[in-house]
Amino acid sequence: MKCPFCGDPNTQVADTRENEGGEVVRRRRRCPKCDKRFTTYERIDLKMPHIVKRNGNRSEFEHDKLAGSMKLALRKRPVTLEALDAAVDRIEAKLLALGEQEVPSEKVGELVMRELKKLDKVAYIRFASVYRNFADVDEFAEVIREVKARPKRNRPAEPPEPTSENDLFRS
């Protein structure tokens, strides 16, 4: 690998370590010419499928766009950034597991709604109202009835207090 300091192509690996999950390899390198050290990271580069929009247009999958739309739905809700990141990771893993080169945007939307429903019911309703393009209050009421009809699992009567400063946009 080429030295970022002097450009010499003959660098040497001084140390190699894997992260805990074995997903990333960290290498400490040394340049024999300028004697400077630097770190490189090696990770698997998986190709996310392209997204086919409702109008037929195709676009590349964008992690930041997915996370941003979920973050918007979760605005001022007691959900941590870690929980959001984990949900985005699960969606990406499901998309990769499909093994398809192209995935309809509807599939992505359904995966997002499924994850938001697990994270926060209000965020789920917010996202669903935009995603499903609710035309009137009756459609909101129907989704609220659907959410209320589902059994609650060990849910406290009051929303939990934020446990860290990573609670999204809590004010």
From Swiss-Prot:
On cofactor binding, the record's note says: Binds 1 zinc ion.
Q: Does the keyword Repressor apply?
A: yes
GO biological process terms, semicolon-separated: negative regulation of DNA-templated transcription
Which keywords annotate this record?
A: ATP-binding, DNA-binding, Metal-binding, Nucleotide-binding, Repressor, Transcription, Transcription regulation, Zinc, Zinc-finger
| Keyword set includes Cytoplasm | no
Zinc finger regions, unnamed: 3-34
Q: Which residues form the ATP-cone domain?
A: 49-139
Instruction: Show the segment(s) annotated as Disordered.
Output: 148-171
User: Per its Swiss-Prot or TrEMBL entry, what cofactor is needed?
Assistant: Zn(2+)
Residue runs in coiled coils: none
InterPro entries, alphabetized: ATP-cone_dom (IPR005144), NrdR-like_N (IPR055173), RNR_NrdR-like (IPR003796)
Q: Which PROSITE patterns does UniProt cross-reference here?
A: ATP_CONE
- GO MF terms on file? ATP binding; DNA binding; zinc ion binding
Name the protein family: Belongs to the NrdR family.
Give the function comment from the record: Negatively regulates transcription of bacterial ribonucleotide reductase nrd genes and operons by binding to NrdR-boxes.
Q: What is this protein called?
A: Transcriptional repressor NrdR
